[in-house]
Amino acid sequence: MYSFIRNCLFKLDAEVSHELSLDWLGAFERLHMLKPFALKVTPSPINVMGIDFPNRVGLAAGLDKNGDFVNALGQLGFGFVEIGTITPLAQSGNPKPRLFRLPEHQAIINRMGFNNKGVDHLVAQVQKRRYPGVLGINIGKNKITPEENALDDYVKCMDKVYAHADYITVNISSPNTPGLRNLQFGETLANLIAGIKQAQDRLAQTHDKYVPVAVKIAPDMTAEEIHSVADTLVNGNIDGVIATNTTISREAVQGHINADEAGGLSGLPVRDKSTEVIATLSAHLQGAMPIIGVGGIVEGADAQAKIAAGASLVQIYSGFIYKGPKLIAEAADAIASAG
């Protein structure tokens, strides 16, 4: 059934079909019609960052930016759902068109630019949620905020979402917000992490609960840069690292009609690069921090490969678009069967 729906949606503009599919998903949930789409997912409970996850397969940020579809997505079998990226103020993002499919490569290029309705809208939606599972909230900075003031935006978001999140992800790796990836390096990263940790400590006291913070990094780094980022995160007592975001490389899709579109490339072409980053992180961290692996999972074996490389959890997004909810069960089964 999903293949038929996907083929119909793929005849439309990519962003139109994205919005339409979410609207349908929400409608099906309200009408209690999601069961045919949700397969039985093999339980593989694990505790990561102090949180109990029912299985290791989560939804990556970006699909539900505003928290409008948490209840529906939560019924599909995910072990956790991450929403966002959200910013303090609503923003429209980059001009359209800004989302492109590469079906031959099971890939997507996006230059959305953190389009979202603002953190207050997301919090209002999350407060109404019926989904009882693990919820991550991914936060970013507004485009109009100068790079040197980025910490202010992250703290504003943390202040608003802390009470409602099971974990918070700090997104410093999207290629679609000018200067954002500069936050990943050197003293800039160290100062940002120190400020985020200070905010986390303050909020933990205020709310009498500890909400872990993970940092999402880019795949386009050398081994030395990955080591440096990892050391900064460990020294800053960050709770986890998500590897990776989209890539700006086009090596794997050269010749495709959309290959030269600006933005981040996700899906199958980023699979191996993401897994290599996970392996590099794992070898360097030696268990000092859990890794959440994301990037290019289009079948169960891809998810298991990321676990084997050192990830404790995995997330899917582009593969979910191409394969549908069955990928959740396939990934969870592959991980569980590998032990």
From Swiss-Prot:
Pfam families: DHO_dh (PF01180). The keyword Membrane applies. InterPro entries: Aldolase_TIM, DHO_dehydrogenase, Dihydroorotate_DH_1_2, Dihydroorotate_DH_2, Dihydroorotate_DH_cat, Dihydroorotate_DH_CS. Signal peptide: none annotated. Its EC number is 1.3.5.2. It is a peripheral membrane protein. Keywords: Cell membrane, Flavoprotein, FMN, Membrane, Oxidoreductase, Pyrimidine biosynthesis. FMN binds at A61, G62, L63, D64, K65, T85, N138, N171, K216, T244, G267, G296, Y317, S318. Pathway: Pyrimidine metabolism; UMP biosynthesis via de novo pathway; orotate from (S)-dihydroorotate (quinone route): step 1/1. It catalyses: (S)-dihydroorotate + a quinone = orotate + a quinol. Binds 1 FMN per subunit. Substrate binds at K65, N110, R111, M112, G113, F114, N171, N176, N245, T246. Its cofactor is FMN. The active site is at S174. One of its GO terms (molecular function) is dihydroorotate dehydrogenase (quinone) activity. It is found in: Cell membrane. GO terms for cellular component: cytoplasm; plasma membrane. One of its GO terms (biological process) is 'de novo' UMP biosynthetic process. It comes from the Bacteria. Monomer. Catalyzes the conversion of dihydroorotate to orotate with quinone as electron acceptor. This is Dihydroorotate dehydrogenase (quinone).
